[in-house]
Amino acid sequence: MKKTLLCHFYNEEYMLPWFLNHHKQIFDHGVMIDYHSTDRSVEIIKSICPTWTIITSRNPDFQADTIDTEVNDIESQIDGWKICLNVTEQLIGDYSILNDEPKQLLVPSIFMVDCDRERNVTQDRPLYEQKFDGFMFSDNQQNFLERRSRSLHNVPVHYPANSTHECMAPGRHWNTYNTDQLVTLYYGWCPMDDGGFARKLQIQTQIPLIDRQLNRGFHHITNKETLTYRLENEFIPRSRNLLKEIEFYVNTHKNLSNIL
């Protein structure tokens, strides 16, 4: 059954090489929704994944509910397995469970944290071969809720406009998970070098007034000092070395990544 990745992005030239080089091994096709990028993002996509579709968003900015509505509309035209991820998320694990049985998989996250900022990263190697610290969804409920599940499905799924018992909205984050054979490696706080700080700081320019008034996307309204404080006081103290856990998913990925 065909597998399609959706992703909305704005000026993500720093993270895109890792995101694209990983997912092109897994998905038959990708639909990249461009929120009017002014950097090399589109050029990078065309270079690494030349057969993928690039759509210019109908939305002028990152208004959370209209993002989800646009994703809903695009997904409704796609058959087979589909998932919408941010550029900071990488799906990895046992892809053999993506069979023809109709189902919705709620995929949890491993929250990666840059505890060793002195170790430089390179874009010609996967991030999972360079950074190994963070915290696991399975360790406790707080860790799971820090980055809730994504929906990977081959049945119709509607992203709600407001939060429900099942889903935190807007944003498409689900409040439970039903598999640990697949996970997303979440790199929103790793690496936190100059490129990592720059991408987090530029997102706030795309948060509209209506979302600010509704207290949506408030975590994007920030500065470098606040980001550094959160990294050092909120995330690093909770982190541990996850090399063993990451190797499990990476080895499974390497064994199965050609199963499309």
Language model regions located:
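Active-site-proximal specificity loops/subdomain of glycosyltransferases
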Residues: 4, 18, 40, 44-85
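Active-site beta-to-alpha loop of glycosyltransferases that engages the nucleotide-sugar donor
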Residues: 2-21, 36
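A short acidic, amphipathic alpha-helical/loop segment
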Residues: 18-22, 44, 96-98
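Catalytic-site signature of metal-activated, phosphate-bearing donor transferases
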Residues: 64-73, 91-260
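Receiver (REC) domain switch/active-site residues of two-component response regulators
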Residues: 28, 50, 88
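Short beta-strand/loop segment that forms part of the nucleotide-sugar
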Residues: 28-36, 56-57
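Active-site acidic Asp-centered loop
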Residues: 35, 85-87
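Short, acidic, metal-binding catalytic loop of nucleotide-sugar glycosyltransferases
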Residues: 21-29
